[in-house]
Amino acid sequence: MSSKNKLMLILGAVLGVLYLLMFRYQLINAQFHELGGLALFALVLVHIFMNRKRITSFISNFHNKPLKARAQIIVDAVFGFSMLTIIGTGVAMAHTLPVNLGAHSDVLITTHTVASFVGLAMMGV
């Protein structure tokens, strides 16, 4: 196994554990939840950067791909959209970080939570 593959495996494991840990909001404090969310965002960007060639080749010629490959692309896109939603609403609602936008409403909380569970479901597909 190459060093890049080992790094990707470790990164994937860290991303998965951190994502699941964020669901236990009641057991961790708000600051850890918010910092963990920002770390998750940074690690997702690293993951995308490290896989950019694979992602590009996977997406190219979408309509010529077999049905299973197209379904996987759609699942990945839904997961990506849920991550963007989680990050956007999380930053908007943050209250323990210097990035305090002060947006805290039931709609944002619900959107953040639903997007989190949609992302979790997409991870399982």
Feature-to-residue mapping (PLM):
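Membrane-embedded alpha-helical bundles that constitute the cytochrome b-like, heme-associated redox core
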Residues: 1-125
